[in-house]
């Protein structure tokens, strides 16, 4: 029986060989993006600069380059960043639904809700149950205790965060890959005001909860803002097979949108500024700002899961 990592690698390779099958390549070319392969890690990516040689991963570039230099058109509070996304997507026909519980009582393979797509696995994704809407958005509180060692190190990790979902459930003929991709691309450029030249889009694959598919990761200045997964497959003992529905699973860290719009040293200063100030006051902690600002742009490279 093949493991999930092996299956993900197979899908990633198929997508690399035939990107038109999985990705919105017509939209990318319409926007003036070209496909390249990272000279450092070998990953395929799309960028406005046709001569670009490296992908957007912080390990392949200069870490976080948005610190003290936010690329967005305005600074957003944590509440405002959700409201901006919600208004933008509702105007485009998505239904905004309420969050699900963080205890995943409808599943027998996990205890906690770890991402927005968990809310719909396995029964909605498999077609056994009706979705609350065919095209929806959701601000889903998510728990990830496997990230404990990264909290406070990378500047972006939490054990309790909000995964904003753009989720769609459609029959094959009704599934509109180009539109779903365009909606998120234009939210980034028009909604957040990030210049197209800042966007680096990675081809990859994702799997979890018994499903998997190719995906497109959106990077800006060394930070992955969100990941749009084209969840077309169900994992089986023999490998994987196509789902009856075509499922879109975009997951965006709410905290990262707030962070990149503020350009603070870590996301915590943007998401919970009052809490941090209170903690400094209570502990008497004084931060060496010069050392802090030199170190934190490179904290992106300290993901415990990815370093030796």
Protein language model features and the residues they cover:
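Cysteine-rich micro-motifs
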Residues: 49-63
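Generic signal for short, ordered secondary-structure residues
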Residues: 17-20, 24, 34, 67-68, ...
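Structured aminoacyl-transfer and RNA-binding surfaces used for tRNA recognition/handling
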Residues: 66-308
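Short acidic-hydrophobic surface loop/beta-edge motif
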Residues: 36-39, 216-218
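Short cysteine-rich clusters marking metal-coordination/redox-active sites
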Residues: 38-41, 55
